[in-house]
Every structure is written in C-alpha cells, then in structure tokens.
C-alpha cells in the first residue's frame, strides 16, 4: 500500500512543479524557531528530492547556511497532505542552476548565470502522506 501512495504523491508533486504552483517550505531561523514560506518547486524526483530556486542573499539561503534541516508540505483542501522531512543544501554549480532554471525566474534574476541566483536541493529522509483517505509513514 505504501508504494501506491508514494507513487500518487510523486505524481502530485510533479503536477505542482514550476512557476504556477506552490508548496510550503519550513526552515529553522537563527534563533532556532521554525519558519514557513511558500515557494515553487523547480524539479522533483517523486518524493526523493525536490529543488527550489531563490536568491543567494535572501533569508532562506541564510537560514539554510545555519541549519540544513527542512520540511516541505503540499496540501489541497482535504484531498491530500504530503509532508516530507529531510535536509536541504544550497547549490551554486552553473550546470545545476541552468538545469533548474524556468521562465518565471526572469522576474527576479537576469538569467541562470546571475550570481545572486541559487538552487536549493531538498532530500527527503522521512515522509507522512495522506492521499485518498489513506496514510503512509516511512523513511527513505
């Protein structure tokens, strides 16, 4: 049963990638408190990993520099709740930045080679999935 729910979660995440969709990214601030903000997923491999694009000098990047623990949540009015917990890192490799670039980012950055632009790579360690009134908990 977990495999079926995990596959459905991966399909939902795939549908929620790009500039038009959002999820909630929770990080730990400099004082040790949780913070949550909406962000678009640029790419994903099911529930295994997700990437986000943001500014290197922004608050998200600063928080990740201090603490690489994070959670991601996708939710739709009772239809599903996908919560992933894991680690997150800042990636500035030019090839990765180019691969993760999407058109919506041009409102914030001059291009994939903009030094202010970075990629955040989230890797799931554990999950809590609730889809079609079925729940799956586990670790990867």
Where are the model-predicted features located?
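Extreme N-terminal tail/first-helix region
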Residues: 1-23
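N-terminal leader/targeting helix
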Residues: 21-48, 52
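A short mixed-secondary-structure module that forms the rim of ligand-binding clefts
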Residues: 42-79
